Amino acid sequence: MTQPTRPSVTCDQGSSTIGGTAAQATTSSSATSGSNYQRDRLGRRPEIGVGGQPQICFPRPRSAQQPVLFSLMNSSEAAMKKTLPKSHLSRVIIHDNRITQRIYEMEVSALEKTKKKISHYYEHLKKKFMTEQLRKLGRWREESVNSNRYLTFGIPPPV
């Protein structure tokens, strides 16, 4: 008692068309002309089973259409995101932006502190200059008063 041989079933990895399975499901002895037609049409060799057994080949199931990536990224970032979907690229970019923002804020605060210091130093130098000028002016007045006493020759100064 021999059991009838069952046809082998495989999954066609490269085929995305369903029309290629009809000629492959028939036996090789009865469909040589159909197989040649199929080979010429699709550019493949016909599948020949071992011992003349029919071989049934199913195409891979089609997946749902790929979702379109929509973002405000430029194309290179979008391509990087598409090729590395499980990467933490967005987190890295956000982290890098935070670090850059922090550095920028530190530079701005340091610049503001420097401006304040320079402003205070400028005010200090201006005040020092003015006091020195007032001191000189006062000393010149005293000297001029003292020298005018000797130069008056008895003429009283105007009142």
Swiss-Prot record:
Q: Where is the composition biased (Polar residues)?
A: 1-13
Say which domain of life the source belongs to: Eukaryota
Q: Where is the composition biased (Low complexity)?
A: 14-35
Q: Where is the composition biased (Basic and acidic residues)?
A: 38-47
The annotated region (Disordered) lies at 1-57
UniProt xrefs under InterPro entries: C5orf52 (IPR038935)
Q: What is this protein called?
A: Uncharacterized protein C5orf52
Q: Which organism is it from?
A: Homo sapiens (Human)
Task: List the lineage, top down.
Answer: Eukaryota, Metazoa, Chordata, Craniata, Vertebrata
Its gene name is C5orf52
